[in-house]
C-alpha cells in the first residue's frame, strides 16, 4: 500500500529523534525514506503519524533495518530503508491494521 506519511525515528543508542517518510507499510514492516545514512542491522524506535477521520493518531514500533538503497531525487540524496518489526504493542498493531485497511 503506497502512502506518504510522516514518521519520527530514534536510533536506540542516539539521544535525538530524526524525521522521515513512510512510503509503504505491511503488517510485518515498513519502507521508509530518510536523508540520514544508517547502517543495516540498526534497531530503531519508530512513530508513524496518520489521520483517522478528523484527528491525527500514531503507532509506535521497534524495528530493524534489513536493507537500504541510496536514492538521488530532485537533487537531494537520501536512503530508502526496509524495516522489519521487532516489537509492536497490541494497541499499536490494531492502529496499523486500521491504517492498512484504508
Which residue ranges define each predicted feature?
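Short, conserved beta-turn/loop elements at beta-strand boundaries and strand-helix junctions
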Residues: 27, 68-74
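N-terminal helix initiation/capping motif
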Residues: 1-27, 97-102
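C-terminal output/interaction extensions
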Residues: 72-102
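Conserved hydrophobic positions within beta-strands
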Residues: 22, 63-65
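Short coil-to-beta transition motif at edge beta-strands of beta-rich domains
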Residues: 2-6, 38-50
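Short alpha-helix capping/helix-loop boundary micro-motifs
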Residues: 28-33
Amino acid at each position: 500500500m503506497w502512502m506518504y506519511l510522516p514518521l519520527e525515528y530514534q536510533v536506540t543508542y542516539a539521544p535525538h529523534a530524526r524525521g522521515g517518510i513512510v512510503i509503504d507499510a505491511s503488517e510485518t514492516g515498513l519502507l521508509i525514506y530518510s536523508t540520514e545514512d544508517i547502517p543495516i542491522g540498526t534497531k530503531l524506535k519508530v512513530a508513524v503519524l496518520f489521520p483517522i477521520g478528523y484527528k491525527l493518531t500514531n503507532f509506535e514500533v521497534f524495528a530493524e533495518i534489513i536493507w537500504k538503497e541510496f536514492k538521488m531525487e530532485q537533487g537531494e540524496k537520501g536512503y530508502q530503508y526496509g524495516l522489519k518489526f521487532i516489537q509492536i504493542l497490541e494497541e499499536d498493531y490494531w492502529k496499523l491494521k486500521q491504517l492498512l485497511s484504508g
